[in-house]
């Protein structure tokens, strides 16, 4: 099989992780930046461009031809129009962002865009613990909580691409308000940010 190379980006509320990988899942280069998610969408896009240019420079030095970029982002993503619609409460101003268009203009490389948890779940199905399985449920816990469901080897998106937002499944009836506008969501009680929010007052009282 002829090797093909791509840049993969995992955008989160805490960090931006990026890598140069091939079509067999082998990593050639990895990097990480502290996310500017609390600043603005423009600041975050600038970080993505910086990360991509760093990976591009490495690839050029080694003589690897990059075929494209894959970006995983929190929130609700319109994959057809390649737009972040919203729903990423941990990134300031991250809504109605034509992210793939921005990245292609800035870098000259074609870009694919998807929900971060969905893409991680698909990657785990193809290369990780889910290899050989036709049905997979994937859960990621970090600044927020995301999830993916793979049925017959294909991602299940549900209505308006919101079907696997597992972090916003109501966990506690009449629970505390979540940043998404609902109440009692899993993410509000079990993400790393919520853990700090819920436990810090108790720690300070000790």
Give residue ranges: language-model regions.
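Short, acidic, Ser/Thr-enriched surface-loop or helix-capping motifs
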Residues: 22, 79, 150
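Short glycine-rich, Thr/Ser-proximal phosphate-binding strand/loop in the N-terminal lobe
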Residues: 3-44, 83-86, 161
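Residue-level signal for inorganic ion chemistry
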Residues: 71, 195
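Conserved active-site "lid/cap" helical segment
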Residues: 47-60
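Conserved small/polar residues in nucleotide/adenosyl-binding loops
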Residues: 196-202
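Glycine-rich phosphate-binding loop and adjoining helix at the ATP-binding site
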Residues: 37, 41-49, 64-69, 76-135
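Short glycine-aspartate micro-motif
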Residues: 6-10, 66-70, 136-140, 179
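Glycine-rich phosphate-binding loop of actin/hexokinase-like ATP-binding domains
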Residues: 131-189
